[in-house]
Amino acid sequence: MPYHPQPSQIKAYLVHGDYRPASTFVCSDVDLNAIHDMVNYTLRCLTFSGYMVDCPHLERAGYGGDGNSSTQAFQTMYDAAPTYMNWLQAWGDVMQEDGGLPHVAPAGGGGGGPYWCGFIVLAPWRTYVNYGDSRLLERYYDNMKKWFGY
């Protein structure tokens, strides 16, 4: 840039998925309210691409371990069932013929362990528990069995 912009000349935009809130939280403890607001902001920042990413500025990879760690919070705070329908489709697509799974979907690759690949099992189950929606369990049950067999 040929000049140093002033703060009043700079605009920033939060790019995120259009999620309908599923719950609210307010309490008398300002610190807990602040923590809740930070978690809310973080989840919005990490779910702008149809699946949850590990960070919005580096890899932007859909690690299963990150998904497993945050599914409960994300699904409690938002109606995120469409995101999980999309993301589980990606996990089904990257499954290998022998039942093996990478640690990341949709791109594949990454590093981790069973907790990362286990997203194919835990995400459909948690979606059922949190929303009463059994479609992911029905759709990916064979994938789950295949992965367990691997």
Predicted regions located by residue number:
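Helix-terminus loop motifs that line ligand-binding clefts
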Residues: 78-150
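Extended acidic/polar, glycine-enriched regions
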Residues: 1-34
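Solvent-exposed loop and edge beta-strand segments that line ligand/cofactor-binding
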Residues: 51-64, 105-117
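Extended ligand-binding clefts on enzyme/binding-domain cores
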Residues: 57-78
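Activation corresponds to long, low-complexity, non-globular regions
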Residues: 26-40, 49-50, 54
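Active-site-adjacent bridging/hinge elements
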Residues: 9-15, 38-48, 90-100
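Catalytic cores of large soluble enzymes that bind and process phosphate-bearing ligands
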Residues: 24-27, 31, 62, 76-80, ...
